[in-house]
Structure formats: C-alpha cells, structure tokens
C-alpha cells in the first residue's frame, strides 16, 4: 500500500503539471477560435493547426524543461539546497505558461479587431475564464510549493498572531519598572544608587509614566469562542496567497472592460500585471520581497491606475490607487526618511 507521503507527492505533482499545461491549451483554443473567424467556416485547417501547435509546445517544454528540472530537484537535493531566494518551479510557470498566455490574450483581441475592422464592434466584455484560469493556476502552484513542508494530516498551529507584529513601543517599559523587576538591582540597591546620576524630580516623574502598551487581546479559552479562535497555518496559506495577489487580479479584470481592451491601454495593463507576477518566483522569506513588491507592483500601478482614471474615468477603483500610493509612500518614509536626522528622533508618546 502506498504511503501517505508518496500519495501527497504524486497528487501535488499532478496538480502542478495541470496548472502548468492547462492554461496554455485553453488560451490557445480561444485564439484558434478567434483566428478561425477570419477564414471560411467550412475550413478548419487553421483551427486544428493552432491547437496541434499548442499541444506540441506543451509537450516540448514538459519533456525538455519541466520533467528534467523536477527530476533534478527531487533526486539531487544538494542542488535544491543551493538555490537561495527564488523558486525554480514558479519561475518555469511564469516564463513558460503565464507569459505566453497573456501574449495570446492580447493576440485574441487584435485578431477580433482585424475581423471586424474596428474596435467598436468588439464584444462588450472579454471572456473572464482564460485570464482567471492563468492567475488561479499560478496561485495554486504557489500554495502547493508552500504546503510541501507541512503534513496534510494533524493540526499545525499558526505561529503568527494574526499577522500583527508587535512594535517596539509595545515592549518598552519605564526605567523604574525595569529596576523594580531586576533581581540584581533588588539585591544591591546601594550599588545601583551609586552609579545612577541624579535627575530632577520632573524628569523622574516623566520617566515613571507608563508607555502605550496597545489594546489587550481577548481570551478565548472555552466554549464556542475557543472553537472559533482556532487557527491553522495551512489554512492561512490559502487565505494570504489569494489576498497577496488581489491587487493584480483586480488589475487584470480591468483589462476586460470595453474601454480598456478596445484601446491601447490593454498593453500597459497586461505588461505591468505580468511584471507584478514576477514576485511570485521569490521565496516567501526573501528579505528583498518587500522592496520588490513596491518596485514591481505598487509603484507601477500608481501610474497605470492614475492614467486609467484620467483617460477613461473611474473604471479602476480609487481605493486601489490610494492603496498603491500609501504603500509606496509608507515604505519610502519608514525605511529611508526616518534615517535622516530630522525624522530620526524617537517618539515616546503614543499620540
């Protein structure tokens, strides 16, 4: 009987291969259907030629790239351990699947324009299934790669408290509290007093003031609250993987708006959406990921969304534009401007 580890490995590999191959076949079938409209309806030669070429492409990249890389990563573990900061499987999916699919999506629109002779007679909306399938496949491969290190049975508690990291202000204590809680200072008060510098009474009063500790979290130790407060890191992988790409998903959906895909705005939307997807090739704990998220997604999306709103109106949410602006400005301010002298003074007050 096959072990659970072997079954997990086989299922994961089949799902990844399906996510690698199916989007290309679906997008090229859509392109073949659009191209067939330029030919005689009784002649299906070009349709089946495009379909056969797409099948040949998938088979070729599978045999020459996908399978050899997978075998090397599985058999030669020392090579896999030498790869730092990026994920080969996601790189193959982005380059060999996502890039051709987005290219064929643009080609479908151009073919439909050439058929009708004008962009005004194009369909009201582009089909949502092909592009959504491309993004869904990429996100699923990302989730599978993250799930590999976890067992699928048993409980795995989350090590993070709601992704809310404690700030340094929440752990600062006053000088008098530290002296009171220190056993060495309690054992030798004379030595402590001899090394301290005398301070004015006003300064001592200010130092004894409590610092902002943040709101207290509720205790859910019994009853239905305990059941509702359960958290598993594997379930959170699905949640945060989709939330991480919600901005790119919304941007790609904008491309289906008639005012976008009937104009030249389709190109920058797809190009910068693909650039933002390059972040998925990096490991989740890569120290450069925060910088790359701003440089590859939020900063370019500021200009794309601003241009769309100015040229075509609010076809993209203003909230998305505000999010990109605030994320970019906060990253620059807290990581770089706070190192300048005028912004580097430590603020003790919570208000």
Swiss-Prot record:
Q: Is Transferase one of the keywords?
A: no
* Keyword set includes Nucleus: no
Record field: compositional bias (Polar residues) = 177-210
Give the span(s) annotated as Disordered. Answer: 177-216
Membrane topology of the entry: Multi-pass membrane protein
Q: Which domain of life is it from?
A: Eukaryota
Query: TM spans, by residue?
Result: 7-27, 49-69, 88-108, 121-141, 264-284, 301-321
Positions annotated with a glycan in the UniProt record: 193
Keyword set, alphabetical order: Glycoprotein, Membrane, Transmembrane, Transmembrane helix
Q: Which GO terms describe its cellular component?
A: membrane
UniProt subcellular location? Membrane
InterPro entries recorded: Uncharacterised_FAM23-like_TM
Kindly give the PANTHER family that the UniProt entry links to this protein.
TRANSMEMBRANE PROTEIN 236
Entry similarity comment = Belongs to the TMEM236 family.
What's the protein here called? Transmembrane protein 236
Q: Source organism lineage?
A: Eukaryota, Metazoa, Chordata, Craniata, Vertebrata
């Amino acid at each position: 009987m096959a072990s659970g580890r072997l079954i997990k490995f086989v299922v994961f590999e089949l799902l990844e291969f399906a996510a690698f191959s199916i989007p290309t076949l679906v997008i090229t079938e859509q392109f073949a259907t659009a191209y067939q409209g330029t030919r005689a309806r009784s002649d299906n030669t070009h349709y089946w030629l495009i379909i056969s070429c797409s099948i040949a492409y998938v088979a070729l990249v599978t045999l020459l790239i996908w399978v050899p890389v997978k075998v090397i990563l599985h058999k030669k573990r020392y090579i896999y351990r030498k790869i730092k900061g990026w994920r080969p499987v996601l790189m193959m999916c982005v380059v060999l699947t996502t890039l051709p699919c987005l290219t064929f999506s643009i080609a479908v629109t151009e073919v439909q324009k050439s058929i009708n002779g004008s962009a005004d007679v194009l369909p009201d909306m582009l089909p949502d299934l092909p592009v959504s399938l491309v993004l869904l496949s990429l996100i699923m491969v990302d989730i599978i790669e993250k799930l590999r290190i976890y067992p699928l049975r048993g409980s795995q508690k989350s090590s993070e408290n709601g992704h809310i990291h404690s700030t340094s202000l929440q752990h600062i204590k006053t000088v008098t509290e530290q002296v009171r809680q220190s056993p060495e200072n309690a054992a030798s008060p004379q030595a402590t007093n001899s090394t301290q510098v005398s301070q004015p009474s006003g300064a001592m009063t200010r130092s004894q003031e409590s610092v902002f500790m943040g709101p207290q979290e509720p205790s859910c130790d019994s009853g239905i609250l305990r059941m509702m407060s359960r958290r598993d890191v594997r379930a959170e992988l699905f949640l945060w993987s989709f939330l991480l790409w919600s901005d790119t998903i919304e941007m790609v959906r904008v491309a289906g708006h008639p005012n976008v895909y009937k104009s030249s705005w389709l190109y920058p939307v797809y190009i910068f959406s693909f650039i933002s997807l390059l972040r998925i090739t990096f490991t989740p704990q890569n120290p450069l990921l925060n910088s790359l998220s701003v440089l590859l997604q939020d900063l370019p999306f500021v200009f794309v969304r601003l241009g769309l709103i100015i040229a075509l109106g609010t076809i993209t949410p203003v909230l998305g534009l505000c999010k990109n602006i605030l994320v970019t400005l906060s990253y620059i301010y807290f990581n770089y401007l706070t190192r300048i002298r005028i912004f580097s003074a430590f603020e003790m007050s919570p208000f």
